[in-house]
Amino acid sequence: MSDSDNIKGVSRRTLLGTTAAAAGVGLAGGAVVTKDGAGFVSTADAQTKSAAPKAPPARPAVQKTEVAPGELDEYYVFFSSGQSGEMRIIGLPSMRELMRVPVFNRCSATGWGQTNESLKVLTEGMQPATREFLKNRGGTFMNGDLHHPHVSFTDGTYDGRYAFMNDKANSRVARVRLDVMKCDKIIELPNQHTVHGLRLQKYPRTGYVFCNGEDGVPLPNDGKVLDNPKEYHSIFTALDGDTMKVAWQVMVSGNLDNVDSDYQGKYCFSTCYNAEEGVTLAEMTANEQDWVVIFNLKRIEEAVKKGDFKEMNGVPVIDGRKGSPYTRYVPVSNNPHGMNTAPDGIHIVAAGKLSPTVTVMDVRLFDQLFDDKIKPRDVVVAEPELGLGPLHTAYDGKGNAYTTLFLDSQVVKWNIDLAKRAFKGEKVDPIIQKLDVHYQPGHNHSSMGQTKEADGKWLISLNKFSKDRFLNVGPLKPENDQLIDISGDQMKLVHDGPSFAEPHDATIVHRSKINPISIWDRADPMFADAVKQAKADGINLEADSKIIRDGNKVRVYMTSTAPAFGLEQFQVKQGDQVTVYITNIDAVEDLTHGFCIVNYGIQMEVAPMATASVSFSADKAGVYWYYCSWFCHAMHMEMKGRMFVEPKSV
């Protein structure tokens, strides 16, 4: 299929027939007989192979995509990693990976999940029941499913303070400080079972962090109710992005999927599948329509003030189910997925997924909707038919939208104004171009396209399958993130980028919005607990290398300056509870140190002018070398020392 081929006349019957067949495959064990009877293929294989004629090589870009040695990318891209649990930072247009920021995962390189500083972040926002559950399981979750990283706003554009992201696996939300590119807060959401969609308040600032609860469970979920879906409830959460505390929650009808907010600070809105509130695939896809749920922020805030809520696990929960004064439910084609606000501040687009259509709404009509002056479907101003499996929509700031078509393996460029005119009956075609991508695209994102400053230069298509696009690396294949030039009249594919499991969403931010530091401030709160303990022990972290014993608790303080640690040896007793504090006093950009104790499973990063600490039980007697694991000096190999663990028998 060529770039300019437009799929027309795709009927709902045809699409649902294909989808129903795929659903049937899932119920039957994931295999179907091929049309020629040759054998069995998986659903995913059938989709990718049917959509994947051999594509021509990527064409030269209209814009300059090469970033020469010594030059810098124009954009940061903050990528999710799905089940890997980290946030990744990519440069655009080079598509080079710049950094990985551990969040919900355990990171061997940095010690995230082992250092005291990271463990505080990972545990302080836990619910009490979870803390008890994990008490004999290492104290923290060892996995995460990081989706939807989004950067904080002021007045409708990025302000570079924070990135927020959700953990679908363990119902958490994290905040990453963009001045140091480190996670500083994680909260587990009470009452909510999974967090899928996450977006931020755009105006006047962030503000609220909006978190969709996808799956319904009994409330409280204590085992007293099990297989009774009528008593399951889904929860929508608004966090305070400054305090990382829950501001309020709303109980809704159906499963929430993706969410976005307006540019006026009045509404946020979520796609909702499973209006049937079923628990099986057949039940969840039975109805012809689901809905978009619109949340009235002012009314919800007033409800909290006047006490119109039920307190559950210490937070106010408002009843926003169908018929509530705090929400409105707009019918759309069944199982909608993506929800994306256009940079014009007027239009929002809900993608159909099981329908070839997307639904365009005008946020200026929401006031009338909540005042009951119009009906829910009256806010719909266009519903163009785009192709098979529309999932997510991005924008160029010029009135055009770009929607991924999962089943067609395409990105379709279409015009919002033309779609509105066609909706009114005018004989115009809103589709401008279709571009083959490789393969099965999910999220897509344009440069600055989620702000009022969309610049219409670049689009990334995050494709779920790569198949034949890269060297074969075995059964587990990389994803394929494809860079598309959208600066001209026609989309042009310019780059294939492999990525490990598994990006769900990304945010493209102009580099002028982000201003990280290179050397830590000694007053930074990240290691404030270490500073406090050192002060109590009479230790100057930037000068002293000493050992403090308090019963069987031993605190080892040492500086590090390449190529030497402040202590070349220290001695403890078997069974001592040891905490080692390392302060890197090299105030030199990019001179990171590491601290690793051989055969003790200890490893951590110590960045310039930072203090890092790790606690462990000295259970193995003997001599154990420690060394700097970051190559920081020509004498790197000699930057080491010995830990003596005196056996109990001595």
Swiss-Prot record:
Gene3D superfamilies: Cupredoxins - blue copper proteins, YVTN repeat-like/Quinoprotein amine dehydrogenase. Pathway: Nitrogen metabolism; nitrate reduction (denitrification); dinitrogen from nitrate: step 4/4. Its EC number is 1.7.2.4. Pfam families: Cupredoxin_1, nos_propeller, nos_propeller_2. Its main location: periplasm. Binds 2 calcium ions per subunit. Cu cation Z4 binds at H504. The keyword Zinc does not apply. Residues 1-46 form the signal peptide. Its cofactor is Ca(2+); Cu cation. It is found in: Periplasm. Residues 552-650 are annotated as: COX2-like. It catalyses: N2 + 2 Fe(III)-[cytochrome c] + H2O = nitrous oxide + 2 Fe(II)-[cytochrome c] + 2 H(+). InterPro entries: CcO_II-like_C, Cupredoxin, EfeO_Cupredoxin, N2O_reductase_N, NO_Rdtase, Nos_propeller, NOS_propeller_2, NosZ/Cyto_c_oxidase_sub2. GO terms for molecular function: calcium ion binding; copper ion binding; cytochrome-c oxidase activity; nitrous-oxide reductase activity. Ca(2+) 1 binds at K464, E479. Cu cation Z3 binds at H148, H443. Predicted to be exported by the Tat system. The position of the signal peptide cleavage has not been experimentally proven. GO terms for biological process: denitrification pathway. Belongs to the NosZ family. In the C-terminal section; belongs to the cytochrome c oxidase subunit 2 family. Homodimer. This is Nitrous-oxide reductase. It comes from Bradyrhizobium diazoefficiens (strain JCM 10833 / BCRC 13528 / IAM 13628 / NBRC 14792 / USDA 110).
